[in-house]
């Protein structure tokens, strides 16, 4: 029986970490791709040489020609420029939009049946552009954002309450940026909503708001500490969770930047919402009820994403 094939487009810190995690989980054979010849080949060889020690059997290769991704079942896109201190995700738009055009053409030619996960920032605009450039069905192209943002929220909550991260569920809606919407009402500790924990005296509203703000600033906090790059371990783990749900038809309920066609009152945009990911790609978008405050915050986030998409169209009118 043929193994699944996973193409990792971009061989930087996230790409290398993705290759290692996909190998450890034996999700399939792996191709690390990058236009910088030598880097994917070197990283592929290095990770392959860890397989006898760590006990995984996959064929892991590096390549600098798009033909190497031919027939991939999953493509995870990290290609582009990473953030540096003082930069917002949006500052990357012009540079990375050109990268998405090249990547989209490569996927369209060699892996038109793949499930595509985009990580490149500014995420919501880049995954929207990538879907347009590639021509793939919208349900087969998704952005990795909500899993990461929710994971950060879960960690901060677990530390605050001194409980296991496994007993914390968290919910983050909207764009992957400063306007993201961590929803306290739909986030729980041991099944108890955060809003109830405020009433029970576990945490004050003010402290909860501080945790929510730290979640929004989660990426920038790491960029500020690293100084020469951005997060890669948690983003890679988040994308692998999505890929695994697709490859194994697990039908996980995961918050992702998904294409909306009327849901939440939004059309032809990628925004972070709860989805079900299975063998059909994004099989369902779950619409939850939002109160007035939550809806206003979500609409503000959607507006920020819409502005980025407009900026993309100004640079590449073919996207219209």
Swiss-Prot record:
Catalytic activity field: (S)-malate + NAD(+) = oxaloacetate + NADH + H(+)
GO molecular function, one term: L-malate dehydrogenase (NAD+) activity
InterPro entries: L-lactate/malate_DH (IPR001557), Lactate/malate_DH_C (IPR022383), Lactate/malate_DH_N (IPR001236), Lactate_DH/Glyco_Ohase_4_C (IPR015955), Malate_DH_type3 (IPR011275), NAD(P)-bd_dom_sf (IPR036291)
Role played: Catalyzes the reversible oxidation of malate to oxaloacetate.
Entry keyword annotation includes Oxidoreductase: yes
The keyword Oxidoreductase belongs to this UniProt entry's keyword annotation: yes
Database matches in HAMAP family: Malate_dehydrog_3 (MF_00487)
EC numbers, comma separated: 1.1.1.37
Name used for this protein in its record: Malate dehydrogenase
Gene Ontology biological-process annotations: lactate metabolic process; tricarboxylic acid cycle
Record-listed substrate binding positions: 83, 89, 121, 152
Residues of the active site: 176
Protein family: Belongs to the LDH/MDH superfamily. MDH type 3 family.
SUPFAM superfamilies: LDH C-terminal domain-like, NAD(P)-binding Rossmann-fold domains
Annotated keywords: NAD, Oxidoreductase, Tricarboxylic acid cycle
Residues holding NAD(+): 10-15, 34, 96, 119-121
Pfam families reported in the protein's UniProt record: Ldh_1_C, Ldh_1_N
Enzyme class, UniProt record, top EC level: oxidoreductase
């Amino acid at each position: 029986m043929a193994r699944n094939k996973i193409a990792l487009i971009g061989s930087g810190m996230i790409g290398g970490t993705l290759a290692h995690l996909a190998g450890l989980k034996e999700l399939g054979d792996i191709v690390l791709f990058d236009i910088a010849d030598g880097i994917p080949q070197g990283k592929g060889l290095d990770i392959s040489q860890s397989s006898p020690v760590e006990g995984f059997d996959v064929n892991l290769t590096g390549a600098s020609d798009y033909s190497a991704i031919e027939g991939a079942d999953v493509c995870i896109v990290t290609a582009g420029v990473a953030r540096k201190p003082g930069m917002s995700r949006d500052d990357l738009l012009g540079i990375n939009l050109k990268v998405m055009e090249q990547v989209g053409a490569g996927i369209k030619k060699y892996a038109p049946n793949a499930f595509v996960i985009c990580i490149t920032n500014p995420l919501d605009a880049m995954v929207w552009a990538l879907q347009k450039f590639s021509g793939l069905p919208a349900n087969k192209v998704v952005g990795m954002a909500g899993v990461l943002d929710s994971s950060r929220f879960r960690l901060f909550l677990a530390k605050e309450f001194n409980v296991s991260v496994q007993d914390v569920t968290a919910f983050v809606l909207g764009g992957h940026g400063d306007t993201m919407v961590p929803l306290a009402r739909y986030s729980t500790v041991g099944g108890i909503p955060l809003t109830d924990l405020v009433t029970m005296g576990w945490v004050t509203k003010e402290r909860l708001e501080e945790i929510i703000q730290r979640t929004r600033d989660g990426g920038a906090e790491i960029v500020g500490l690293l100084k020469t790059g951005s997060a890669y371990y948690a983003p890679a783990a988040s994308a692998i969770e999505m890929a695994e749900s697709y490859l194994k038809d697990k039908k996980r309920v995961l918050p992702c930047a998904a294409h909306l066609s009327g849901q939440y009152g939004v059309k032809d945009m990628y925004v972070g919402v709860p989805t079900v990911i299975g063998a059909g790609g994004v099989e369902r978008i779950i619409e939850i009820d939002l109160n007035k405050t939550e809806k206003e915050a979500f609409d503000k986030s959607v507006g920020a994403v819409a502005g980025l998409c407009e900026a993309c169209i100004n640079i590449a009118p073919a996207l219209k």
